A protein has these predicted regions:
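Short, flexible loop segments at boundaries between secondary-structure elements
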Residues: 113-121
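Acidic, divalent-metal-coordinating active-site segment for phosphoryl/phosphodiester hydrolysis
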Residues: 146-159
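Acidic two-metal-ion nuclease catalytic site recognized across multiple nuclease folds
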Residues: 157-181
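Beta-strand segments within the central parallel beta-sheet cores of soluble alpha/beta enzyme folds
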Residues: 111-113, 173-174
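Conserved non-catalytic scaffold segment of RNase H-like nuclease domains
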Residues: 1-111, 123-145
Length: 181
């Protein structure tokens, strides 16, 4: 199980690019997974995007385009259950496009657990933005909109959901993944 989050130059995966990614969690033997890197998008980062995540053109200079990160990225996500907030609707679309741009096969994951979809399915009261849910569940998100902080928060949020609604999680992870589809 690995948490994934991205920061990008904008919202459209067809025209915008990744500027930071994080993969956090543990593998099947319980050892820690932690990979976080800035990425040179090969274009200028718009000021309105920098205003959200704080990542500047100077920050990413020399970080390598995403195609230079795919080996390490693939090694972690291949066959993994990927957890993230809006990971299906946003993050994985960017990952998919970056692999296509690089002429590479997109890694095959075991499945996704999207904490945004899960919050809606569980009918959690209030807004379902990651920051709002973290406030509700007392999850520290001081560095919101940085990939490592958001990926970690998504994993903790999943754990909080599992503790609050144990009856909804009394099945193998594959069953949980299927109910979110």
């Amino acid at each position: 199980v690995v948490g994934l989050d991205l920061e990008t130059t904008g919202f459209d995966s067809r025209s915008e690019r990744i500027v930071e990614y994080a993969l956090v969690g543990s593998d099947s033997d319980g050892s820690h997974i932690g990979l976080c890197s800035l990425v040179d998008p090969g274009r200028r980062i718009p000021p309105d995007s920098t205003a959200v995540h704080g990542i500047t053109n100077e920050d990413v200079r020399g970080s390598g385009e995403f195609s230079e990160h795919t080996d390490a990225f693939s090694k972690i996500v291949e066959g993994a259950i990927v957890v993230g907030h809006n990971v299906i609707g946003f993050d994985w679309g960017f990952v998919h496009m970056e692999y296509l741009r690089a002429g590479l096969e997109v890694p095959k994951v075991r499945g996704f657990i999207d904490t945004l979809k899960l919050a809606r399915k569980l009918r959690i009261p209030g807004r379902h933005r990651l920051g709002d849910l973290c406030d509700r569940y007392s999850i520290d998100l001081e560095r919101a909109h940085r990939a490592d902080a958001d990926a970690s928060a998504s994993l903790i949020l999943l754990w909080k959901f599992m503790n609050e609604y144990p009856e909804r999680f009394r099945k193998p992870l594959d069953g949980i993944i299927e109910t979110l589809d």
